[in-house]
A protein has these predicted regions:
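Conserved N-terminal segment of class I S-adenosyl-L-methionine
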Residues: 1-122, 126-128, 139-146, 162, ...
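Short catalytic micro-motifs in class I SAM-dependent methyltransferases
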Residues: 130-135
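Helix-to-beta-strand junctions that scaffold the AdoMet/dcAdoMet cofactor pocket
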Residues: 136-137, 152-153
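Conserved helix-to-beta-strand junction in the class I
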Residues: 147-151
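Conserved beta-strand signature within the Rossmann-like core of class I S-adenosyl-L-methionine
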Residues: 153-162
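Feature marks short, surface-exposed loop/turn motifs that line or immediately flank catalytic pockets
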Residues: 164-166
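Short glycine/proline- and charge-enriched loop/turn segments
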Residues: 170-179
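A SAM-dependent methyltransferase catalytic signature shared across enzymes that methylate proteins
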Residues: 191-205
Length: 228
Protein backbone atom coordinates (compact mmCIF):
# COMPACT_ATOMS: atom_id res chain seq x y z
CA UNK A 1 0.00 0.00 0.00
CA UNK A 2 1.29 3.44 -0.91
CA UNK A 3 2.37 5.62 2.01
CA UNK A 4 0.95 9.13 1.56
CA UNK A 5 2.52 10.55 4.71
CA UNK A 6 5.51 12.25 3.09
CA UNK A 7 3.32 13.74 0.34
CA UNK A 8 0.85 15.06 2.88
CA UNK A 9 3.60 16.47 5.10
CA UNK A 10 5.12 18.33 2.14
CA UNK A 11 1.68 19.67 1.18
CA UNK A 12 1.01 20.84 4.73
CA UNK A 13 4.34 22.64 4.95
CA UNK A 14 3.86 24.34 1.59
CA UNK A 15 0.30 25.44 2.41
CA UNK A 16 1.34 27.17 5.61
CA UNK A 17 4.29 28.89 3.96
CA UNK A 18 1.95 30.77 1.60
CA UNK A 19 0.97 34.38 2.21
CA UNK A 20 -2.03 36.06 0.53
CA UNK A 21 -1.82 39.28 -1.43
CA UNK A 22 -3.77 42.27 -0.10
CA UNK A 23 -6.59 43.77 -2.16
CA UNK A 24 -4.51 46.90 -2.75
CA UNK A 25 -2.11 44.84 -4.89
CA UNK A 26 -4.78 44.78 -7.61
CA UNK A 27 -4.80 48.48 -8.42
CA UNK A 28 -5.37 50.44 -11.63
CA UNK A 29 -1.89 49.64 -12.92
CA UNK A 30 -2.39 45.91 -12.40
CA UNK A 31 -5.50 45.90 -14.57
CA UNK A 32 -4.75 48.43 -17.31
CA UNK A 33 -0.96 48.82 -17.64
CA UNK A 34 0.93 47.13 -20.51
CA UNK A 35 3.05 44.81 -18.36
CA UNK A 36 1.36 41.57 -19.48
CA UNK A 37 2.50 39.51 -22.44
CA UNK A 38 0.84 40.67 -25.68
CA UNK A 39 -0.51 43.77 -23.89
CA UNK A 40 -3.27 41.68 -22.31
CA UNK A 41 -5.03 44.51 -20.50
CA UNK A 42 -8.48 44.64 -18.94
CA UNK A 43 -10.09 47.32 -21.09
CA UNK A 44 -13.27 46.20 -22.85
CA UNK A 45 -12.02 46.04 -26.43
CA UNK A 46 -8.87 44.12 -25.48
CA UNK A 47 -10.95 41.68 -23.46
CA UNK A 48 -13.50 41.37 -26.28
CA UNK A 49 -10.74 40.13 -28.59
CA UNK A 50 -9.31 37.79 -25.97
CA UNK A 51 -12.69 36.39 -24.94
CA UNK A 52 -13.57 35.52 -28.52
CA UNK A 53 -16.42 33.00 -28.49
CA UNK A 54 -16.62 32.69 -24.69
CA UNK A 55 -19.55 35.04 -23.93
CA UNK A 56 -21.73 33.57 -26.68
CA UNK A 57 -20.76 30.04 -25.65
CA UNK A 58 -21.69 30.74 -22.04
CA UNK A 59 -25.15 31.77 -23.18
CA UNK A 60 -25.47 28.84 -25.59
CA UNK A 61 -24.11 26.08 -23.34
CA UNK A 62 -25.64 27.07 -20.00
CA UNK A 63 -28.70 29.13 -21.03
CA UNK A 64 -28.44 30.92 -17.67
CA UNK A 65 -31.13 33.08 -16.12
CA UNK A 66 -28.80 34.64 -13.54
CA UNK A 67 -25.00 34.59 -13.52
CA UNK A 68 -22.52 35.41 -10.76
CA UNK A 69 -18.92 36.17 -11.73
CA UNK A 70 -16.71 35.42 -8.71
CA UNK A 71 -13.51 37.43 -8.89
CA UNK A 72 -14.88 39.53 -11.73
CA UNK A 73 -12.13 42.17 -11.74
CA UNK A 74 -13.24 45.33 -13.59
CA UNK A 75 -16.29 43.54 -14.99
CA UNK A 76 -15.20 42.94 -18.60
CA UNK A 77 -16.85 39.52 -18.89
CA UNK A 78 -19.87 40.87 -17.04
CA UNK A 79 -20.18 43.62 -19.64
CA UNK A 80 -19.92 41.18 -22.55
CA UNK A 81 -22.60 38.95 -21.02
CA UNK A 82 -24.76 42.00 -20.32
CA UNK A 83 -24.55 42.87 -24.02
CA UNK A 84 -26.09 39.45 -24.72
CA UNK A 85 -29.01 40.17 -22.41
CA UNK A 86 -27.79 38.05 -19.49
CA UNK A 87 -28.58 39.10 -15.92
CA UNK A 88 -25.13 39.14 -14.29
CA UNK A 89 -23.63 40.22 -10.97
CA UNK A 90 -20.03 40.17 -9.77
CA UNK A 91 -17.87 39.96 -6.66
CA UNK A 92 -14.28 41.16 -6.46
CA UNK A 93 -12.07 42.04 -3.53
CA UNK A 94 -10.22 44.91 -5.23
CA UNK A 95 -11.74 48.32 -4.47
CA UNK A 96 -10.46 49.43 -7.88
CA UNK A 97 -12.69 47.01 -9.79
CA UNK A 98 -15.97 49.00 -9.72
CA UNK A 99 -14.25 52.27 -10.60
CA UNK A 100 -12.63 50.65 -13.66
CA UNK A 101 -15.78 48.77 -14.69
CA UNK A 102 -18.07 49.84 -17.55
CA UNK A 103 -21.00 51.93 -16.28
CA UNK A 104 -23.50 49.29 -17.40
CA UNK A 105 -22.26 46.82 -14.77
CA UNK A 106 -20.43 49.01 -12.25
CA UNK A 107 -23.24 49.00 -9.71
CA UNK A 108 -23.57 45.21 -9.95
CA UNK A 109 -20.12 44.54 -8.50
CA UNK A 110 -19.88 43.82 -4.78
CA UNK A 111 -16.47 44.59 -3.28
CA UNK A 112 -15.57 41.79 -0.91
CA UNK A 113 -13.51 38.66 -0.38
CA UNK A 114 -14.44 35.75 -2.64
CA UNK A 115 -13.81 33.52 0.37
CA UNK A 116 -16.82 34.98 2.20
CA UNK A 117 -20.59 34.74 1.55
CA UNK A 118 -22.09 37.80 -0.17
CA UNK A 119 -25.22 36.31 -1.74
CA UNK A 120 -28.02 34.02 -0.66
CA UNK A 121 -27.49 30.28 -1.22
CA UNK A 122 -28.36 28.88 -4.67
CA UNK A 123 -29.27 32.31 -6.02
CA UNK A 124 -27.59 31.86 -9.43
CA UNK A 125 -28.02 29.01 -11.87
CA UNK A 126 -24.48 29.64 -13.15
CA UNK A 127 -21.50 30.75 -11.08
CA UNK A 128 -18.35 31.61 -13.02
CA UNK A 129 -14.88 31.82 -11.50
CA UNK A 130 -12.23 32.36 -14.14
CA UNK A 131 -8.52 33.06 -13.72
CA UNK A 132 -8.95 33.74 -10.00
CA UNK A 133 -7.78 30.74 -8.00
CA UNK A 134 -4.16 31.03 -9.13
CA UNK A 135 -4.01 34.38 -7.30
CA UNK A 136 -5.09 32.84 -3.99
CA UNK A 137 -3.41 30.67 -1.40
CA UNK A 138 -4.53 27.05 -1.23
CA UNK A 139 -6.52 27.83 1.92
CA UNK A 140 -8.23 30.74 0.18
CA UNK A 141 -8.92 28.59 -2.88
CA UNK A 142 -10.68 25.96 -0.77
CA UNK A 143 -12.89 28.59 0.89
CA UNK A 144 -13.61 30.17 -2.50
CA UNK A 145 -14.74 26.82 -3.90
CA UNK A 146 -17.15 26.57 -0.98
CA UNK A 147 -18.63 30.00 -1.81
CA UNK A 148 -18.82 29.28 -5.55
CA UNK A 149 -20.82 26.15 -4.89
CA UNK A 150 -22.93 27.72 -2.16
CA UNK A 151 -24.11 30.42 -4.59
CA UNK A 152 -24.97 28.05 -7.46
CA UNK A 153 -28.30 26.33 -7.95
CA UNK A 154 -27.02 24.36 -10.93
CA UNK A 155 -23.70 24.96 -12.75
CA UNK A 156 -20.20 26.06 -11.83
CA UNK A 157 -17.75 27.02 -14.59
CA UNK A 158 -14.15 27.43 -13.43
CA UNK A 159 -10.94 28.19 -15.27
CA UNK A 160 -7.51 28.64 -13.76
CA UNK A 161 -3.84 27.94 -14.42
CA UNK A 162 -3.09 24.34 -13.41
CA UNK A 163 0.15 22.68 -12.38
CA UNK A 164 1.74 21.58 -15.68
CA UNK A 165 3.57 18.53 -14.24
CA UNK A 166 2.13 17.51 -10.86
CA UNK A 167 3.87 14.69 -8.98
CA UNK A 168 0.71 13.87 -7.06
CA UNK A 169 -2.83 14.94 -6.34
CA UNK A 170 -1.70 17.50 -3.74
CA UNK A 171 1.00 19.11 -5.89
CA UNK A 172 0.84 22.84 -6.51
CA UNK A 173 3.31 25.36 -7.88
CA UNK A 174 3.68 29.02 -8.88
CA UNK A 175 3.92 30.92 -12.18
CA UNK A 176 5.61 34.13 -11.11
CA UNK A 177 7.23 34.73 -14.49
CA UNK A 178 3.78 35.25 -16.03
CA UNK A 179 2.24 37.17 -13.13
CA UNK A 180 3.90 37.76 -9.74
CA UNK A 181 0.56 37.05 -8.06
CA UNK A 182 0.20 33.56 -9.59
CA UNK A 183 1.05 31.78 -6.35
CA UNK A 184 -1.11 28.65 -6.62
CA UNK A 185 -1.31 26.40 -9.65
CA UNK A 186 -3.22 23.39 -8.36
CA UNK A 187 -3.42 19.89 -9.75
CA UNK A 188 -6.54 20.01 -11.94
CA UNK A 189 -7.97 16.85 -10.39
CA UNK A 190 -7.43 18.17 -6.86
CA UNK A 191 -9.57 21.18 -7.70
CA UNK A 192 -12.15 18.86 -9.22
CA UNK A 193 -12.16 16.89 -5.95
CA UNK A 194 -12.87 20.05 -3.95
CA UNK A 195 -15.86 20.81 -6.19
CA UNK A 196 -17.13 17.23 -6.01
CA UNK A 197 -16.98 17.39 -2.20
CA UNK A 198 -19.39 20.34 -2.37
CA UNK A 199 -21.96 18.09 -4.06
CA UNK A 200 -21.23 18.81 -7.73
CA UNK A 201 -20.72 16.24 -10.49
CA UNK A 202 -18.31 16.68 -13.40
CA UNK A 203 -19.76 17.50 -16.82
CA UNK A 204 -16.97 16.53 -19.26
CA UNK A 205 -19.33 17.09 -22.19
CA UNK A 206 -19.76 20.75 -21.24
CA UNK A 207 -16.07 21.12 -20.40
CA UNK A 208 -15.24 20.05 -23.94
CA UNK A 209 -17.65 22.60 -25.40
CA UNK A 210 -16.32 25.44 -23.24
CA UNK A 211 -12.65 24.57 -23.86
CA UNK A 212 -12.90 25.57 -27.52
CA UNK A 213 -9.35 26.95 -27.46
CA UNK A 214 -7.96 23.62 -26.22
CA UNK A 215 -6.05 25.05 -23.26
CA UNK A 216 -7.11 22.34 -20.82
CA UNK A 217 -7.99 24.89 -18.13
CA UNK A 218 -11.77 24.37 -17.93
CA UNK A 219 -13.86 22.66 -15.26
CA UNK A 220 -17.65 22.46 -15.46
CA UNK A 221 -19.72 20.74 -12.80
CA UNK A 222 -23.43 20.47 -12.05
CA UNK A 223 -25.11 20.38 -8.67
CA UNK A 224 -26.48 17.02 -7.57
CA UNK A 225 -29.54 18.30 -5.73
CA UNK A 226 -30.28 15.10 -3.86
CA UNK A 227 -26.77 14.97 -2.38
CA UNK A 228 -25.82 18.62 -1.73
Amino acid sequence: MRDFTSELNAFEAAVFEQRPFPAERYDDEYFVADWREAHNRYDIETRRQIEGRNPALIKQVFAPRRVLDMGCGPGALMHLLHELGIDVDGIDFSPHSPTLAPPEVRDRIVVGEVTEPHVEPRTYDLVICREVLEHLTVLQARRTVEQICRASSRYVYVTTRFHPEPDGLLSFTTQLDVDPTHITLLNKEFLRCLLVLEGFRSRPDLEQRMDWAGKGRVLVLERQTDRA
